[in-house]
Amino acid sequence: MRYFSTRDKKLNFSFREIFSRGLAPDGGLFIPSEIKKYSNSELKSLQDLSYTDLATEIISNFCSPDLDKQKLKILVSKAYNNFATKEVVKIKKVGDIYLLELYHGPTLAFKDIAMQVIGNLYDELNIADKKKVNIVVATS
């Protein structure tokens, strides 16, 4: 997958490059060169996957070839292993309303859903590059 800058489509980068940069050198945002369109049969095959397998399937579209699907699955599984529930997120019905519980991560915040995976991706991508990274996250 290649990514380009919103300010200059001639600037394009790999997943590894955008992950370590954050913003494009021209100050633009990174946009994927393509977004996979799932067929109805593909969507149907996704509906019974665990949250971890679904996350792996979707994220893999954006990080290939820099990170293969098997390695990604290990990183995603590791990220969600320390959640309080094996489902990672739970849906709870209260009367006629369905609530999505996003607080089962290690800090009890919805941000755990993304940040646990992102932390593992930084570890994996920077181990190969021998870089150190500090991630600063603010609470909502």
Locations of the language-model features?
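PLP-dependent amino-acid enzyme catalytic core
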Residues: 1-140
